[in-house]
């Protein structure tokens, strides 16, 4: 690695976050702060490079404390209060002066998924999920942070890294993508901090077009 950064991972117990953590430890020299609601659920894999911090992402003060000295924030968050979490993250980052944010969202927040798959996606995700993730994304996009929104297709646990991307305003491609692929994309964004700055990026596995993911 040509540089070493201090990374704060929010929602560090998530599946994608754990995969990204593993890749960051194996392939980079970055220092990691793992932030999650219950610290007992996660053990540090490398005490020299990792610190586990317990906190709630809606608690701006605990976020501000965790953000001290951080270069890049990677947020792997979920829940019905995702919009409130987004507001808290933006506020804390602005207060401390941290600019770079990688935020995992979901496909469909702009109604960008075409055809029968788009209809199926609405049927599966409308009624609270898409709406809250769209609202959270709007909070991030309306901030002056140096953000990248990542919009994964339906997630699989396949042991492959294979993905392509689409930009906001383009029709979403494919139906699915592996968590391992999203983790790999996140690590690339961390290693190239200027990449996809203030962009919202759809991520899918190539050649997975269809009416729904293969595992449905």
Region spans (language model):
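N-terminal Rossmann NAD(P)H-binding glycine-rich loop of SDR-like oxidoreductase domains
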Residues: 5-27
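NAD(P)H-binding glycine-rich loop region in Rossmannoid oxidoreductase-like domains
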Residues: 2, 7-8, 34, 39-95
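Active-site-lining helix/loop region of Rossmann-like oxidoreductase modules
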Residues: 10-15, 130, 139, 157-159, ...
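Glycine-/Pro-rich loop/turn segments that contact NAD(P) or position catalytic residues
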Residues: 81-166
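Nucleotide donor/acceptor-binding cores
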Residues: 5, 30, 99
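Short beta-strand "acidic-cap" motif of Rossmann-like dinucleotide-binding folds
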Residues: 32-34, 150
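A generic structural motif
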Residues: 28-32, 196
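Residues in the short beta-alpha loop(s) of Rossmann-like NAD(P)-binding domains
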Residues: 13, 38, 107
